[in-house]
C-alpha cells in the first residue's frame, strides 16, 4: 500500500511539473536559436559549426524533456561522441576540441574554429577527456517561456530524406 501511494505521489509530482512548463512556440524558438550564438557550436541543416552536436534531426533523437534538460543542465548527460578533449603537444601547445576519431597512432578532432585537425600520438605529451562540455546553461539567462520555445523548435527538427549526421 505504501509503495502504491509513493508511485502515485511521484506520478502526481511529475504531472504537476509538466503542467508548470509553459507551452512552447517553435517559430519563437527558431528566432531564439538564431540570435543566441547556438550556431557558434551547433549545426542545423547547412548552417552553423560542427564543434557541437548536429541538431538537424534532434527532435527524432530526443524527447522534449531531454531537450529541456540539455538546455538547463548540459553537463549532466554528455554523449561520448560529444566529449571534448585537451591535447598538449611535446612543444607545450594546448589544443581543445571535440574528439572525432582516435586509434593507436593518431587523434582527430574538430577545433573551436571548426577545423578538422589530426595529431600524431607520438607528438603529444598529454591527452585528456574534459569533464565538462562547452555548452552553457540557459537557466537564469532565458525565461521559462523562452526555454519552452527553444524546446518546441528543437523537437520539431526531424530526420530528412537526405540524412543529418555528423
Predicted segments with their positions:
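Electrostatic cytochrome c docking/interface patches
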Residues: 13-34, 49-53, 63-66, 90-94, ...
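Extracytoplasmic/periplasmic beta-strand context in beta-sandwich domains
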Residues: 30, 53, 83-85, 133
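The canonical Cys-X-X-Cys-His
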Residues: 29, 35-45, 55, 135, ...
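Sec-exported extracytoplasmic/periplasmic mature domains
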Residues: 34-37, 46, 60, 72, ...
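C-terminal capping alpha-helices of c-type cytochrome domains
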Residues: 17, 22, 94-97, 102-107, ...
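Structured surface patches comprising rigid loops and adjacent beta-strands/short helices at the edges
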Residues: 114-115, 119-134
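Short Fe-S-cluster ligation motifs
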Residues: 68-89
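Bacterial N-terminal signal peptides
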Residues: 1-9
